[in-house]
């Protein structure tokens, strides 16, 4: 599974009969969806980019000077004149120089002098700014079902599907082959102020240097360098890279201030680096809030027979995934396809299966399968795959796991923000409350009641509510009613 290889992983667990779940996807993260009776899926935000954004300004980092000319006049002879002064693309400076008999003037005094030089820009020495258009930014979301095949981090799963969204996109339906269809309706949000963001790109001259940065518009517009708009052949403020020496009679030296790339790179230290891939300019931050429809998903392999328990062997022994789950892979030498008998028991309870399978209904196929991921309660456990067994100690605590999943649920609801609430009708408002409860408490509820069946949870909720109605102490009554209501809501709810 894709999420297994990423550090930033979240789990969203649907309750009995779940048909829709709401996800918050961010760059660099991955969400695993599990729901009873449905295949598990990994969903992640793969990229945020715009193709060929519009250019705003080009800056020159190294001037190319040519055709220097100087004109001088003796005192009282009027101002010196060069026709280049009126030409676009030249830099000129007027001054006064000391004149006399030694330099061909009949009078001693200050005479007029003017120097001009043609200014262009050296090749591969430009810094170009690009601006994003919020309506053209593409958000790429990828979906991958848990098929039971092990896929390395640098490999691509054959069942991986891609959906793209913009601010005007509508619902997208992805076909996952034998696992049915999944629908995605995503609201997009960039993590930066696009109106104040410029991508500054340098002409690439060295492989080891970054070539683009994400900078503020005001900082970009204030750069003290020659600039022009795209398509204009002449540079504005070209004098910023030209220095004129002190005048001497009929001579005035012109100096090129040199390459300013190093100065610009020093100013960009600590600025977020932008990623450019071909004509795609990527954003480094942003998120999408997606409503995922699970109603047309279907489990694969439910009609398979159980595998022969004696013909399994470990290919990868159980290993900590780093996400509070255990991953393993087995090989099978018997008749295929078949369903893998897998369970786990806690110390002192040999008859109770405590494994919560992230890979639902694991199977061995004719061309693969055998990868299993599960979540176990903290403490000593024994994992059984057929007749294979492996002792496993799960670190952590149940209370800590509950707090962690609740914290993630609150973060998820905070990111969804106003879109989580529907005040248009009473039904919509109460539905929003139910969805918010699922978002915040769904993970904690699953951690506590993960191994409890539907009917026991239903009876527990009814019993708590009955105790609340029949308890005379107001505080106890409200506590029982709230607990019972939450258990019933999480058990009977169809949206998360």
Swiss-Prot record:
Gene Ontology cellular component list: host cell endoplasmic reticulum membrane; membrane; viral envelope; virion membrane
Cytoplasmic side: 469-479
Entry-linked InterPro entries: Flav_gly_cen_dom_subdom1 (IPR013755), Flavi_E_Ig-like (IPR027287), Flavi_E_Stem/Anchor_dom (IPR026470), Flavi_E_Stem/Anchor_dom_sf (IPR038345), Flavi_Glycoprot_E_cen/dimer (IPR011998), Flavivir/Alphavir_Ig-like_sf (IPR000336), Glycoprot_cen/dimer_sf (IPR036253), Glycoprot_E_dimer_dom (IPR038055)
Keywords: Clathrin-mediated endocytosis of virus by host, Cleavage on pair of basic residues, Disulfide bond, Fusion of virus membrane with host endosomal membrane, Fusion of virus membrane with host membrane, Glycoprotein, Host endoplasmic reticulum, Host membrane, Host-virus interaction, Inhibition of host innate immune response by virus, Membrane, Suppressor of RNA silencing, Transmembrane, Transmembrane helix, Viral attachment to host cell, Viral envelope protein, Viral immunoevasion, Viral penetration into host cytoplasm, Virion, Virus endocytosis by host, Virus entry into host cell, Zinc
Residues annotated as transmembrane: 448-468, 480-496
Segments of this protein annotated with the region Fusion peptide: 98-111
Pfam families linked: Flavi_E_stem, Flavi_glycop_C, Flavi_glycoprot
Stretches assigned to the Extracellular side: 1-447
Domain of life: Viruses
Glycosylation site positions: 154
Signal sequence residues: none
Disulfide bond sites: 3-30, 60-116, 60-121, 74-105, 92-116, 92-121, 186-290, 307-338
Single GO MF annotation: protein dimerization activity
Gene Ontology biological process terms, A to Z: clathrin-dependent endocytosis of virus by host cell; fusion of virus membrane with host endosome membrane; symbiont-mediated suppression of host innate immune response; virion attachment to host cell
Name listed for the protein in its UniProt record: Genome polyprotein
Source species: Louping ill virus (strain Norway) (Li)
Upper lineage: Viruses, Riboviria, Orthornavirae, Kitrinoviricota, Flasuviricetes
């Amino acid at each position: 599974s894709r999420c297994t290889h990423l550090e930033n992983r979240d789990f969203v667990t649907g309750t009995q009969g779940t048909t829709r779940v709401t996800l918050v996807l961010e760059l660099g993260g991955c969400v695993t969806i599990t729901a009873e009776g449905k295949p598990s899926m990994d969903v992640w935000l793969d990229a945020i980019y715009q193709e060929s954004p519009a250019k705003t300004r080009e800056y020159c980092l190294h001037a190319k000077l040519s055709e220097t000319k100087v004109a001088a006049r003796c005192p009282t002879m009027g101002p010196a004149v060069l026709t280049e002064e009126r030409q676009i693309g030249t830099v000129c400076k007027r001054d006064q120089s000391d004149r006399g008999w030694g330099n061909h003037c009949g009078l001693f005094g200050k005479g007029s002098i003017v120097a001009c030089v043609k200014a262009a820009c050296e090749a591969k020495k430009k810094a170009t700014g690009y601006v994003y258009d919020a309506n053209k930014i593409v958000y790429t979301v990828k979906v991958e079902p848990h098929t039971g095949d092990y896929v390395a981090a640098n490999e691509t799963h054959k069942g991986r599907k891609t959906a793209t969204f913009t601010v005007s996109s509508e619902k997208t339906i992805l076909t996952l082959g034998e696992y049915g269809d999944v629908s995605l309706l995503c609201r997009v949000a960039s993590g930066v102020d696009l109106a104040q963001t410029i991508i500054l790109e340098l002409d690439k001259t060295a492989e080891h240097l970054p070539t683009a940065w994400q900078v503020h518009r005001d900082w970009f517009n204030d750069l003290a360098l020659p600039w022009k708009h795209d398509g204009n052949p002449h540079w504005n403020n070209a004098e910023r890279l030209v220095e004129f020496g002190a005048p001497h009679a009929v001579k005035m030296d012109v100096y090129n201030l040199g390459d300013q790339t190093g100065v610009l790179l020093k100013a960009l230290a600590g600025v977020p680096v932008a990623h450019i891939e071909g004509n795609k300019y990527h954003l480094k931050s942003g998120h999408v809030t997606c409503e995922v429809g699970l109603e047309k998903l279907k489990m694969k392999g439910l009609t398979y027979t159980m595998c022969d328990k004696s013909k399994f062997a470990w290919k990868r022994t159980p290993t900590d995934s780093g996400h509070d789950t255990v991953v393993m892979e087995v090989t099978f030498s018997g008749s295929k396809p078949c369903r893998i008998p897998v369970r786990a028991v806690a110390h002192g309870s040999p008859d109770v299966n405590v494994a919560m399978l992230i890979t639902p209904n694991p199977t061995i196929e004719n061309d693969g399968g055998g990868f299993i991921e599960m979540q176990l309660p903290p403490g000593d456990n024994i994992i059984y795959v057929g007749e294979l067994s492996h002792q496993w100690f799960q670190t952590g605590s149940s209370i800590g796991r509950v707090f962690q999943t609740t914290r993630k649920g609150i973060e998820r609801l905070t990111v969804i923000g106003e879109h989580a609430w529907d005040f248009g009708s009473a039904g919509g408002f109460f539905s929003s409350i139910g969805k918010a409860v699922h978002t915040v408490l769904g993970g904690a509820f699953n951690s506590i009641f993960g191994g409890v069946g539907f009917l026991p949870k239903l009876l527990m909720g009814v019993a708590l509510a009955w105790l609340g109605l029949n308890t005379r102490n107001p505080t106890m009554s409200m506590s029982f009613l709230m607990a019972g209501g939450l258990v019933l809501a999480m058990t009977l709810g169809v949206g998360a």
